[in-house]
Amino acid sequence: DIKIEHITSIIDSMEPVEGAIEFLQGLESKWPTLILSDTFSQFAKPMMSKLGNPTLFCHTLDIDDTGRIEGWNIRCEDHKRKTVEALTKLNFKVIASGDSYNDTSMLSSANAGILFKPPDNVIEEFPQFPVVNDFEGLMSAIESSASDMGEL
């Protein structure tokens, strides 16, 4: 019987990808920043703490009093795309970055979409998005997109 404490202790033993903390700090110093993820808040909490607790929109788990996972609650279907659409309806300019197929509807809905370290099949299927492979390249692509939108 796997309990939430077992899973979160494993996640807590992990460290952020090298450069992630500095990247997020740099991003947040310039623009409001949201992380949209298909994870669950209870899984993400240890890592988000190490990243300085950035704003995270994701799903939640149902956990009983003993710590056993009983189920999950999906915020809404395709929540990344819907979040970007809501922000653009509020006249925010949105630059989105993602690494996989499940991010492409979000990238398409944003004012600018950037693929970050995607697998080859995603690059091939979505050639309209620029591809970057490190945090320095991602920051440059974001800054360039922001400049093009008059947001720098």
List each model region and its residues.
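A metal-dependent, Asp-based hydrolase signature
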Residues: D1-P32
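Substrate-recognition element of Asp-dependent hydrolases with the DxDx(T/V) motif
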Residues: A20-L51, T55-T60
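Acidic, Mg2+-coordinating phosphoryl-transfer loop and its flanking beta/alpha structural elements
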Residues: T33, S37-D38, K93-N133
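Short, well-ordered alpha-helical microsegments
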Residues: S41-K45, D103-T104, M139
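Glycine/Thr-rich beta-alpha phosphate-binding loop at enzyme active sites
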Residues: N53-R81
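Short, acidic/turn-prone active-site loops that include or flank metal/cofactor-
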Residues: L56-I63, P118-V122, F135-L138
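Short, charged, surface-exposed secondary-structure boundary motifs
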Residues: D64-G71, I123-P130, S140-S145
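A polyampholytic, Gly/Pro-enriched intrinsically disordered region
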Residues: G71-E85, G137, S144, D148-L152
